């Protein structure tokens, strides 16, 4: 049975558990990809696609230039998610330790205010990720979150806002399932969107969506 974690659940993490999760998330930022077999495990990122497997865009969008982006590109280069933990020996901290509680509050604040990359505003981008449908009507989806690793917002707490994209489509996407791996292309905009599954720091109006790879 899966444990569904949203933003509300996130508040009730024990300090030591949250700190360990935070360390684990930072490790996920590293470019470690899942094997190319679609049997994704929690925390897996998408493998680099073979060019022969990339689905061509339809003729209506093929002439539009999209810049392919990675999830690292969505984080400013000078942002250090570990800055709040420098000087702390996490192995020796207990839940009742005031330093653990103080560190937890600092991390939550830094996490919720994670900076976005301003140069992406208004860019036409193409990025792969895992989807979390938000307004499913039957087998049709018009709104979803795109996240960088399998299980984000569902089996683990949400990543920081600069690692979540809120996507809207002009036409419904059929038969999209939670944690499907998809290519999404469109115009990126900077702007927070709060959902029950997580806070997105980016918005994207999708012009082309296709299964990954």
Tell where the protein language model's regions lie, with residue ranges.
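Bacterial N-terminal signal peptides
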Residues: 16-29
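OB-fold and OB-like single-stranded nucleic-acid-recognition modules
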Residues: 33-213
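Serine/threonine-rich, low-complexity intrinsically disordered segments
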Residues: 10-11, 25, 34
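Extended, compositionally biased low-complexity polar/Lys-Gly-rich tracts
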Residues: 12-14, 18-19, 111, 120
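N-terminal secretory signal peptides that target proteins for export/translocation
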Residues: 1-14
């Amino acid at each position: 049975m899966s444990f569904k974690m949203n933003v509300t659940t996130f508040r009730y993490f024990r300090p030591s558990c949250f700190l360990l999760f935070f360390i684990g998330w930072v490790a996920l930022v590293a470019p470690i990809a899942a094997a190319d077999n679609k049997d994704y495990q929690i925390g897996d990122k998408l493998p680099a696609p073979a060019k022969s497997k990339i689905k061509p865009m339809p003729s209506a969008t093929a002439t539009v230039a999209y810049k392919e982006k990675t999830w690292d590109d969505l984080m400013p280069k000078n942002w250090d998610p570990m800055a709040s933990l420098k000087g702390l020996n996490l192995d020796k901290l207990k839940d009742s330790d005031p330093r653990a509680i103080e560190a937890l509050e600092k991390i939550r604040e830094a996490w919720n205010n994670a900076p976005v990359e301003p140069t992406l505003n208004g860019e036409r981008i193409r990025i792969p990720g895992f989807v979390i449908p938000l307004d499913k009507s039957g087998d049709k989806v018009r709104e979803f979150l795109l996240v960088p690793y399998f299980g984000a917002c569902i089996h683990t707490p949400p990543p920081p806002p600069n690692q979540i994209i809120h996507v809207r489509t002009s036409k419904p996407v059929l038969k999209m399932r939670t944690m499907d791996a998809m290519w999404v292309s469109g115009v990126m905009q900077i702007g927070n969107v709060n959902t029950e599954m997580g806070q997105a720091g980016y918005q994207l109006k999708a012009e082309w969506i296709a299964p990954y790879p």
